[in-house]
């Protein structure tokens, strides 16, 4: 795009969602993250960098630097960003997929970037399944037309949420 990059949103502390932030630094954007993001990045960055470098021969990755958020959103708070012709809301969620999940919601188009709070396949369960389901229940109540997941294709909200909510509900009931 020819438009300036004002914000880079690090949606959570998994490497496929934060590596590459350096590519935008020449624009001097605000780096937005959850209030718990920097702590998680600091404790996991070197491990993720080594792991990725062992799997991918890439000088850029080997020389990657830790980029921390300079705008930190408190849990359950929303940062509204005016992009001129639209306002986007960046929300910090309670612990679910990770303890530092952010989403982005475009009020104008009712498009919701869910990062990995929603994915189009059975998710990896490494966090709070009860918290994750709670967050999905909250998303279901939002006025959303389209969901852009962290992995997978853009989908209509109801098509996206019904199967994953059923999966979590069944898993929770059968594990207890």
Predicted regions and their residues:
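Active-site HxH/HxHxD metal-binding segment of metal-dependent hydrolases
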Residues: 2-80
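N-terminal-biased segments
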Residues: 61-63, 84-89
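Metallo-beta-lactamase
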Residues: 80, 87-170
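Generic hydrophobic alpha-helical segments
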Residues: 174-176
């Amino acid at each position: 795009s020819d438009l300036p990059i004002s914000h880079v949103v690090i949606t959570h502390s998994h490497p496929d969602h934060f590596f590459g932030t350096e590519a935008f630094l020449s624009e001097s954007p605000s780096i937005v993250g959850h209030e718990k993001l920097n702590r998680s990045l600091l404790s996991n960055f070197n491990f993720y960098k080594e792991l990725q470098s062992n799997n991918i021969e890439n000088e850029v990755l080997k020389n990657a630097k830790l980029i921390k958020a300079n705008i930190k959103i408190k849990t359950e708070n929303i940062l509204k960003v005016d992009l001129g012709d639209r306002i986007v809301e960046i929300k910090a969620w309670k612990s679910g997929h990770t303890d530092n999940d952010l989403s982005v919601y475009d009020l104008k188009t009712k498009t919701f970037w869910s990062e990995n709070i929603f994915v189009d396949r059975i998710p990896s369960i490494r966090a709070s399944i009860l918290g994750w389901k709670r967050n999905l229940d909250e998303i279901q109540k939002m006025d959303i037309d389209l969901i852009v997941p962290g992995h997978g294709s853009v989908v209509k909200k109801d098509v996206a949420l019904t199967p994953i909510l059923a999966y979590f509900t069944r898993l929770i009931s059968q594990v207890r």
